[in-house]
C-alpha cells in the first residue's frame, strides 16, 4: 500500500478531492467511528497530545465530532452539520498552532490503522481516503516550525 506523506511548503493549499463514498459502504458508520477512535487513542500517547482536549469528556466529544465529519464527507448522514453547522474546518482549527511536523505526526498515526484495513477494504479505497487525509491536512497547517 502506498501511504506516503506529501511534503508541502508553508501556505500551500493543494486542491482537495473528497474520498470515495464506497469506503463508508465497506466500513459502515461503526467501522469508521472505530478508525477515528483508534486514531484518537494513538494521539493520547503521541507528541501532539497537547493539541487535544485534556478533559476526558471533551476528548471523547472531539473524537465524536471527527467521526461525524468523516461520515458526512464520505456521503453518510450529515451528523456534523446537524450538530455543529457548516464544517469550515480551516476556521475551526485556526485557534490551534498546527505546524508541518504536527501534521506529519497526525498522519503517521493513521498509517497503521489504515494498513490494518487491507483484509476487508479494497486497497484503492484506502489509498483514496489516505490521499484525502494527506491533502486536506495541509489546509490545517497555520504555523511555521519554530
What positions do the PLM features span?
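Core of compact, soluble alpha-helical bundle domains
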Residues: 1-146
Amino acid at each position: 500500500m502506498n501511504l506516503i506523506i506529501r511534503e508541502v511548503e508553508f501556505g500551500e493549499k493543494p486542491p482537495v478531492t473528497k474520498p470515495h463514498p464506497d469506503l463508508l459502504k465497506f466500513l459502515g458508520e461503526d467501522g469508521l467511528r472505530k478508525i477515528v477512535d483508534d486514531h484518537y487513542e494513538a494521539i493520547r500517547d503521541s507528541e501532539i497530545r497537547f493539541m487535544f482536549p485534556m478533559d476526558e469528556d471533551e476528548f471523547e466529544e472531539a473524537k465524536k465530532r471527527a467521526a461525524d465529519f468523516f461520515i458526512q464527507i464520505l456521503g453518510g448522514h450529515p451528523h456534523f452539520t446537524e450538530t455543529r453547522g457548516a464544517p469550515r474546518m480551516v476556521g475551526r482549527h485556526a485557534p490551534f498552532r498546527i505546524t508541518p511536523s504536527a501534521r506529519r505526526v497526525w498522519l503517521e498515526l493513521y498509517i497503521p490503522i489504515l494498513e490494518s484495513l487491507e483484509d476487508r477494504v479494497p486497497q484503492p479505497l484506502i489509498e483514496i481516503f489516505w490521499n484525502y487525509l494527506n491533502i486536506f491536512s495541509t489546509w490545517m497547517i497555520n504555523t511555521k516550525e519554530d
